[in-house]
Amino acid sequence: MSSQRWLWRNQHSVQTNIGSREKDLKITKTKKIKKKHERAYELLAEAAYSDPFAALGPFIDDGEGSLRVWMPGANKVELLVNGEPRVALERDGDSGFILKEQRDLHLTHYRLAVDWNGVEQIIDDPYQYHNIYQEYEHLHTPKDMYHYMGAHFVTLERGGENISGVRFLVYAPHASAVSLVGCFNQWDGRRHPMQRLDYGIWGLFIPGLEEGVQYKFELKGPNGEGLPHKQDPWGFYSEQYPSFASITYDHKRYQWQDAKWQNRAVTQKRDEALSFYELHAGSWKRDGKGDFLNYRELAEQLVPYLVDMGYTHVELMPVSEHPFYGSWGYQPVGLFAPTSRYGSPDDFKFFVDACHQAGIGVVLDWVPAHFPSDDHGLANFDGTPLFHDPDPRRGWHQDWNSYIYDLGREHVRRFLVSNALYWFEQFHIDGIRVDAVASMLYLDYSRSHDQWVPNVDGGNENYDAIATLKWMNEEVYKHFPNAMTIAEESTAFPGVSAPTFMGGLGFGFKWNMGWMHDSLSYVKEDPVHRKYHHNTITFPLVYAHSENYVLSLSHDEVVYGKGSIHNKMPGDEWQQTANLRAYYGYMYGQPGKKLNFMGAEIGQTAEWNHDDQLQWFLLEYERHQGVQKLMRDLNHLYRNEAAMHDQDCVPAGFEWRLQDEADASILAHERISKEGERILIITNFTPVPHERFRLGVPNVGQYELLLNTDDSKYGGSDFKVLTSVKTEKVESESLPQSLELRLPPLSTVFYKLHK
């Protein structure tokens, strides 16, 4: 019998490199064949077979052709070929079925009619598709990994037919067997064993699967031990508790409408006005029943609000799928799936799309430092510590009770870098804020002296993490030049936002945690005591240009008993709000990009609660309306005046005018644009007004009032200030001319120079 009449396979040649087979497959006769697959059937029955293409589908055995099918629980199986009569397969053991040569059949593509206790199901046999699992060298490139790993919709051509389905690939090098389970096979691990391929990858193509199908992987450990069902590490969509199943999803379906945004010119982000609104999607607002807004509802309400308030970007706390809502997303399991708490991946794309069409950028918090120990996730994925170091001194984070990614392994680095690139490409995001960078950089982070392992040079720097962060930044900026990466890094590690070719980590920006800590520490003091802490508020300017900084008042400052930003302020209600307004004015006048957590703009009085929406009812009160109006005007002032932002990251954009007036707790400085425009900013951190305050300035001209945080429209005292003031030839602060100003209590005022 000619082997060219079948798509035969030799069972000894398919373990890792399944050979090609003929397109035109014909069955001429069925012959009696010997049963050589008892052991294979035993392993299939235990969902422990790693080489299913050696025993299932059409192949040649001792010169004889046969078609074997493994269908546990089936009563009867028949072969269906277009234009040919049905052919019944004979039973071959408890769950196996075999076709013996009895008649001529032209078999380039076939289906199976399976009888399940009287209910017939037509199945396209996955084990006839053996030549689509090839060429994995491209998986060494992070940009390509997510185009292949996980579940992808593909279309094959067989016998003139287009066969659509889903190709599954998963990395589990130490597993002894992997099966695909899901609603399509009643979660039966015996039904769809996956093929062990090269590079530790397992694969299987399931014809006919559509979007919205739940699935997981059933793995056997290195010694054959059963493991918990695992979510797809590359899964694009997943269910919530209790199943946590992955869901098939096709990224090609969504039709983006943000071409204008995506095609905008590449700009230098350091020179732009960047004002981030940090947001937790589950607690910004709730619907009338107290339930979450979905991504589309959130877009409909949030986007016009951001535009009106003058923010340039929304920064979302992690949306990667996370099983525990109370982690706020910082314990992610599904790094490639936007959480389904708020809708589908298409819904999240709609959210990003709506932001872009309105001119709002989208930044995501990204968590590459650690991952939780949930059974369905990455923890001991293939029965071994595949993604973390087995030594708890390097692989376990004591503060967060989570595993630390082992960045010394190439597959872990690729997995994470691929994930960062994925969000930019597939969801059109504009930036990532990398969480907990300090915990990655230092081997002894939050550890006692005997709980960490030094690097090869005996030091505490994590060389693998440093290399990974550099690589991630290089890849992001190479493929997405308009992107930005931001580090949450709380130490003095040098060059966080310096380019990698200059020895830096390559981030675009770094949160200024020192400014946040020192400035909040200062404003918490009663005004009468602030003069004793004057150095605290001025010290951040010593290092203000050592990195490309973002001044951040993030969610971390309004949780765990810290109270709200508003309630950190001393005094009675009026003084608290006045202090808050003066502080916000001071923040916007400082060099650095701006970030405020949601609720700050309305003067939220309660600590943030992720189980409830913000205190929007506060806007019934004038003083909270005033805070909101002020934040709106500060954002627009910051964006509209080049002096306020285009030299944020260089020393030339800032000059002190008054630094040492500790007794009066008054600070004054000028912001300077590239074109030489100047804005004078003066903050009075006491409730004492000044009728005639003289301040030396280097330029002659007229200063026009731009904004006064004590204005009555913001809820201020409405102490009368000069809307226009001209320099006088009166020496002050060693300068030949000066201004005589009226300074309101607890206020920040902005004046623009007109020469």
UniProtKB/Swiss-Prot annotation:
Pathway: Glycan biosynthesis; glycogen biosynthesis
UniProt cross-references to Pfam families, sorted A to Z: Alpha-amylase, Alpha-amylase_C, CBM_48, GlgB_N
Protein EC: 2.4.1.18
Secretion signal, residue range per the UniProt entry: none
Active site: 435 (nucleophile), 488 (proton donor)
Chemical reaction(s) catalysed: Transfers a segment of a (1->4)-alpha-D-glucan chain to a primary hydroxy group in a similar glucan chain
Keyword check for Transferase: yes
Gene Ontology cellular-component annotations: cytosol
Key word Transferase present: yes
Intrachain disulfide bonds: none
Alphabetically ordered keywords of this record: Carbohydrate metabolism, Glycogen biosynthesis, Glycogen metabolism, Glycosyltransferase, Transferase
SMART domains in the cross-refs: Aamy (SM00642)
One biological process term in Gene Ontology: glycogen biosynthetic process
GO molecular function: 1,4-alpha-glucan branching enzyme activity; cation binding; hydrolase activity, hydrolyzing O-glycosyl compounds
Function: Catalyzes the formation of the alpha-1,6-glucosidic linkages in glycogen by scission of a 1,4-alpha-linked oligosaccharide from growing alpha-1,4-glucan chains and the subsequent attachment of the oligosaccharide to the alpha-1,6 position.
HAMAP family in UniProt: GlgB
Subunit structure: Monomer.
Family indicated by similarity: Belongs to the glycosyl hydrolase 13 family. GlgB subfamily.
Protein name: 1,4-alpha-glucan branching enzyme GlgB
Organism: Vibrio parahaemolyticus serotype O3:K6 (strain RIMD 2210633)
